[in-house]
Amino acid sequence: MKKYDSTKIKNIAIAGQAGSGKTSLTEALLYKSGATDRLGKITDGNTVSDYTPDEIKRKCSVYTSLSSLETGEFKVNLLDTPGMFDYEGEAVEGIAASGCVLITVSGKSGVRVGTHKAYDLAKKMGKPTMFVVTKLDDDNANFNNVLTQLKAEFGPTVCPVVVPVIADRKIVSYVNLIEMKAYKYEDGKAVETDMPTAEVSEKMGYRIDGLIEAVSEAVAETDEALFEKFFSGEAFTQKELIDGIHSGMNSGIITPVTCVSSTDLSGVDMLLKEIDLLLPPPSEKDAMIGETADGEAVEVACVESDPMSAFVFKTVADPFVGKMSYIKVFSGKLTPNKEVVNATTGSTEKVGKLVTLQGKKQIDVAEAGCGDIVVAMKMNVNTNDTICDSARVVKFAPMTFPKPCYKMAVRAKKQGDESKISAAMTRLMEEDLTIDYKLDPSTNEMILSTLGGLHLDSVVGRLAGTFGVEVETSVPKISYRETIRKKVKVQGRHKKQSGGHGQYGDVWIEFEPCVSDDLIFEEKVFGGAVPKNFFPAVEKGLQESVKKGVLAGFPVVGLKAILVDGSYHPVDSSEMAFKMAASIAYKEGMRQAEPVLLEPIGYLSVFVPDDNTGDMMGELNKRRGRVLGMNPAEKKGMTEIVAEVPMAEMADFTLLLRQMTQGQGVFTFEKARYEPLPANLVADVIAKNAVAD
């Protein structure tokens, strides 16, 4: 592939609902442009972008993949992103690196939650968008219904530029509303044909002349001169229509709609032409605001003669070829062996080998100019790092990822593999910023947090398939606590005689409730009943004892212990004896002081569609939650519900919320405090966790 300057490069993310045809569209674009010599199929497991074992097995995208093609004067980098919500982090990376987003919408199932998620993410990042209606060769496809949905859901910015002509429920041709020409497809090639009659248009549910007028109206809104020309009754030239749509996409006031069939390739050539004519290159859209070492904002334009600056938007941890860093160059040019500054960490290193990708195929490149996307091999950089020339050290804002909220305990199937798991998870967390792996000190379990069940399965599969370590997962234990409800005074006496020196320690301790999580120890011994040198032993005995309560072996909180009396033997008393005496007093005192189990309560903030608020309130009541309030969310049509919910009731909440809201709901949940466990649940918890005396 020849070298392209920044005005001739386009970076396009393909996003949308799972199953809406993203990978098939990528395959069709690559094949129709001549970048590949065969049309792969997802069912056959031979597409360019879904090439990992996990993707072939699941028959869906799990990772954002990079491929490229040439159309007209342009090089186009395609970023095929997953549509499954469990892999949303990959979509964040792909859309962040793009200059424009093609959002696929199935002609059969129409606008779905994933359509909104892709659109919202693109708009949040300031990316121009285009809807591509796919699967129009399906007998149940209905373009008119989809177009009506798009206009209703996304407003007046929606502007069709290519529409199908339908007769007897079959597509007979496509109308390009910019060219005002119709094309039919014969043996995969577009042949100009007659425009549909008014009678045909009426039967389709949309009038072609009305749609052409709508395109002109949309273009008129992009420029004052065009506005005046439109209302004077003059027709726009084709160039004015193209320039107007291009400008409207850049400013966000036009979202074109086109349509294709990725299986018979009809409409794909027109989409390539639209990519060529309508979508912005990096030189127009990719000016970035960075931050200097002094914290000052600086604008970085896409100019090749400027000092190099680039952003690492994705990392792949490959145990065989090493770390692969996906990099978007924002200014200057990146070359192998170039010494660069990592503005995020302050370190300096040399750039290694650079490649571009066609799916899994690596193609060496001599340099990457501004606006281009390239993969650097074996660089010591991470996702969200900025690398730059020392002549201008600038750092770009990091991407924001969804927080992992589906938690499972993980343990090695094979004894001794724990260190292998930690090493592998370190690599995977470099690659995927939506997973977390850490020790829960309260239960001594290693907890793996992901975005959902599928995401968890993928991580477990990677551990086994890529790193050779198998794990088992289970619902995390709940970190209950124990405390007391009344003040008691008890004796703890340890006496043992077995020839020679014996063991003797005797203490009287008052135990009472307090508000501290840690044990509070005091001594109020008079007359030397217990020598001062044994006080630390008594405290140590208690500190070790409170790690296990008498009900179910959970740590004890809210306990104050006061050493008030005791006795000793001048020969047989020792630190160990007093430590044992304290332990005996602790056990007896806990039994007498009305011990109680405490459960952790968390603070929940959950956002659901307005239509789901009643269902969610009912669900929270079932889970013993206390609703604290409801607030209208910033996003239209969503409501925030704030509640306190026991952590024991939250194990499957991620999956429940996704099912209830079709993936629209999001939540945060943080531990708040401990409360007494309801009496009807105590026996079950004790039975499952009972500790021998």
Question: What residue ranges belong to the model's regions?
Answer:
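Structural and coupling elements of P-loop NTPases
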Residues: M1-D693
